[in-house]
Amino acid sequence: MALYHFHVEQIKRSEGRTAVASAAYRAGEKLHNLWDGETHDYTRKGGVILSEIMLPEYAPERLFDRYTLWNEVEQIEKHYKAQLAYSFDMALRNEFFLEENIALAREFVQKYFVSDGMICDLAVHQPDREDGGIPNPHFHVLVPIRPLNADGTWGAKQHRVYHLDKDGNRIKKEDGSWAFDAVPTTNWGKPETLDLWRKAWADMVNARLEEKGLVCRIDHRSYVDQGLDLIPTIHEGPHVRKMEKKGIRTEKGELNRWIKATNRMIRSIQA
């Protein structure tokens, strides 16, 4: 069984992160953030093979510009702890040619993200060598959490669903305000949606592997659900990954290297 990687996290101001900085890093560009006045220059970053913005058909053309897109996101989110974007990263296959990997990433993003109204900033990376000399092709997708309305304007992240009594009247809380639940306007953050995406990506990759006559497959399920006695790696986070890419060894990085080596040994014993 080939290795599977599909990770998603939120870009949050509460963690000291910005959408503009995240976009600049993934695209290998220099972008200025109007919200905080910071400029982020990643033009020396290697391994960025492709970067492009994919939009739903009703999105305004100005959002094809990365600087415009992410500065609009920064400006419309007023709260100092705002949740700005979803960040996806997914492993591509060394068994495929570069052009095949790019086509696969585009197809998945269009079919499962853009068609559902998501604005997608896609970047395909192919670093020279990582993790002991193993090529590591992968792609990133940065998506604003706030959706677009059908008229191309920015929509709401949530809407209120008021609590009602048996007669259908709104219920007040002790402080006199109406009781309500804040319900997301999209299903993008739901666990079941993530499960659907994870399986869809595995199915799409496996279909390509079969078309090429290759016997290896990937599995989106956890090791436990697969019935494998393997150790899951721990989440490193952007700061640890940045240090590791600079050649700075970290405790989390060392632990994951040990886990990967142990799992290789377990797989060889079970084979």
Spans of model-derived segments:
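N-terminal nicking endonuclease/strand-transfer module with a His-rich metal-binding environment
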Residues: M1-A271
